[in-house]
Amino acid sequence: MSKIPPALLSEAIQNVLKDRKERKFKESIDLQVNLKNYDPQKDKRFSGSVRLPHVCRPRMTVCLLCDLVHEDIAKKNDVPTMNQEELKKLNKNKKLVKKMCNQYDAFLCSESIIKTVPRLVGPHMHRVGKFPTVCAQNESLPDKVLELQSTVKFQLKKVLCLGTCVGHVDMTEDQVRQNVVMAINFLVSLLKKNWQNLKSAYIKSTMGKSQRIY
């Protein structure tokens, strides 16, 4: 059960959407959360991902590391690819792997070659949090891309503040609300004492002011 006051959330979302201006890029809406009574040194550091009801990052670029069959499917769906031969050419070269990782926001990988990826590219993808998600050939590739564009991750590191994208300013108030509520409820479920560990929460657009929701 969410403890976010509905009226406060509604007002915050309206303020975020009202403040948007015509820009050359689509502003994202971020959820920013501060925790309390948590010790990152002693308490278990959590990490978890959840798929939100609506696509929050439509501009997220996804590349498929693929076998030859999957390559044809990807081309028909305008999904960028790198096949095994192209991956072999990287030859675990740090600079080249880094360049590939910087070029795309996320990666998918054909089920048939997932086990060879660490051998071909080394540990860098894992290190930067971009190790590919498996995509079986019987799964719809466009759906898998949408899934990545709708999924957010929470990971506690050394500081007690967390943030993630939960939408963009072209969404409706209702779509933003559904995404925010699901994201915050999921985060709370990862916390040791649930809502008791939540100090405050805000939403803000890229260029807008922070709006407190908790």
From Swiss-Prot:
Gene3D superfamilies linked to this entry: 3.30.190.20, 3.40.50.790
Recorded GO CC terms: cytoplasm; large ribosomal subunit; nucleolus; ribosome
Keywords of the record: Ribonucleoprotein, Ribosomal protein
PROSITE patterns according to UniProt: RIBOSOMAL_L1 (PS01199)
GO molecular function, one term: structural constituent of ribosome
Domain of life the protein comes from: Eukaryota
GO BP of this protein: translation
InterPro entries referenced in this protein's UniProt entry, alphabetically: eL8/uL1-like, Ribosomal_uL1, Ribosomal_uL1-like, Ribosomal_uL1/biogenesis, Ribosomal_uL1_3-a/b-sand, Ribosomal_uL1_CS
Family: Belongs to the universal ribosomal protein uL1 family.
PANTHER family: RIBOSOMAL PROTEIN L7AE FAMILY MEMBER
Entry protein name: Large ribosomal subunit protein uL1
